[in-house]
């Protein structure tokens, strides 16, 4: 994954907005800022119907851009990060709406950011994703990536989920309840946190198993290391990747999950403080 950005030779920056939201005013402001540095802003086709700016499909946008801006919330950034892995391109998150854990600043602050950026004043962080291997009943394997989490939940709200977890063909644990969350460190502040899972530092090489409303008082979240692959078996359950892709577990004979070797390069302001963000979002201290 991209370790360095040649900030002195940036020619094109791609931009993707959250769907079904008009952000033309914000896009024009970003274009105006980038034009100062002789950088062309190019858009995903769906990002604006009105603006007269170059527009491309997502694959072509990644191919021609030096890096890509996600303009929206954490959800927009999450889906973009999975695609960024395919093209070894970095992503910058600018939020439009509520401040998330992943997007750092609003468009109103972009002028200051890019002034520093084009002087080399920025940082790159590379959180790891989850690899998900879904093997169907014909033996065909579908590989997917998850930036935040993989959630196994009951298909029928009236029933209880029964989820078995194996490691090297030996049963590792068994869960009865509403479901199970497999979260990355970056995703530890999302659904995992709501289910009383631990917060894990974003760049840690680990992942988390957190039961959802377990019917046993002894079931607790556990943090597992990179290289620890689990197999998950559950009948009549749904597997959801990053809240965006759903699969019926009955359609697969094997589902394996572990921390991927793949990471995504996220561009941040140089003064970004992860723990200050936690303090502000979670109201720690004064």
From Swiss-Prot:
Active-site residues, record numbering mapped to chain: 74
A family per Pfam: NAD_kinase
SUPFAM superfamilies: NAD kinase/diacylglycerol kinase-like
Catalytic activity entry: NAD(+) + ATP = ADP + NADP(+) + H(+)
GO biological process, one term: NADP biosynthetic process
Sorted UniProt keywords: ATP-binding, Cytoplasm, Kinase, NAD, NADP, Nucleotide-binding, Transferase
Keyword Nucleotide-binding among UniProt keywords: yes
HAMAP family: NAD_kinase
Annotated source species: Campylobacter jejuni (strain RM1221)
Function: Involved in the regulation of the intracellular balance of NAD and NADP, and is a key enzyme in the biosynthesis of NADP. Catalyzes specifically the phosphorylation on 2'-hydroxyl of the adenosine moiety of NAD to yield NADP.
Keyword match RNA-binding: no
InterPro entries recorded: ATP-NAD_kinase_N (IPR017438), ATP-NAD_kinase_PpnK-typ_C (IPR017437), NAD/diacylglycerol_kinase_sf (IPR016064), NADK (IPR002504)
EC number: 2.7.1.23
Compartment annotation: Cytoplasm
Cofactors demanded by this protein: a divalent metal cation
Gene: nadK
Sequence positions that bind NAD(+): 74-75, 148-149, 178, 186, 189-194, 244
Top-level taxonomy: Bacteria, Pseudomonadati, Campylobacterota, Epsilonproteobacteria, Campylobacterales
GO molecular function, one term: NAD+ kinase activity
Entry GO CC: cytoplasm
Family to which this protein belongs: Belongs to the NAD kinase family.
Protein known as: NAD kinase
Primary site of residence: cytoplasm
């Amino acid at each position: 994954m991209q370790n360095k950005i040649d900030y002195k030779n940036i020619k094109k920056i791609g931009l993707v907005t959250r769907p079904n939201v008009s952000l033309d005013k914000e896009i024009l402001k970003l274009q105006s800022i980038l034009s100062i540095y002789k950088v062309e802003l190019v858009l995903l086709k769906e990002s604006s119907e009105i603006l007269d700016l170059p527009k491309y499909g997502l694959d072509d946008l990644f191919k021609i851009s030096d890096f890509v801006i996600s303009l929206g919330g954490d959800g927009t950034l999450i889906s973009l990060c999975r695609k960024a892995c395919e093209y070894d391109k970095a992503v910058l998150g600018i939020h439009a709406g509520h401040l998330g854990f992943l997007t750092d600043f609003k468009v109103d602050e972009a002028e200051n950011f890019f002034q520093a950026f084009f002087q080399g004043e920025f940082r790159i962080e590379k959180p790891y994703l989850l690899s998900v291997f879904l093997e169907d009943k014909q033996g065909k394997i579908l590989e997917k990536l998850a930036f935040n989490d993989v959630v196994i939940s009951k298909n029928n709200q009236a029933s209880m989920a029964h989820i078995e977890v194996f490691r090297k063909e030996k049963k590792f644990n068994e869960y009865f309840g509403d479901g199970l969350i497999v979260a990355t460190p970056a995703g530890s502040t999302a659904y995992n946190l709501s289910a009383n899972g631990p917060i894990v530092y974003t760049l840690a090489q680990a992942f988390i198993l957190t039961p959802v409303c377990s019917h046993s008082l002894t079931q607790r979240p556990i943090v597992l290391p990179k290289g620890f692959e689990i197999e998950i078996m559950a009948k009549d359950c749904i597997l959801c990747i990053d809240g965006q892709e759903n699969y019926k577990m009955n359609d697969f004979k094997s589902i394996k999950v572990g921390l991927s070797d793949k990471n995504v390069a996220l561009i941040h302001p140089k003064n970004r403080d992860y723990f200050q963000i936690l303090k502000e979002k979670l109201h720690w201290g004064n």
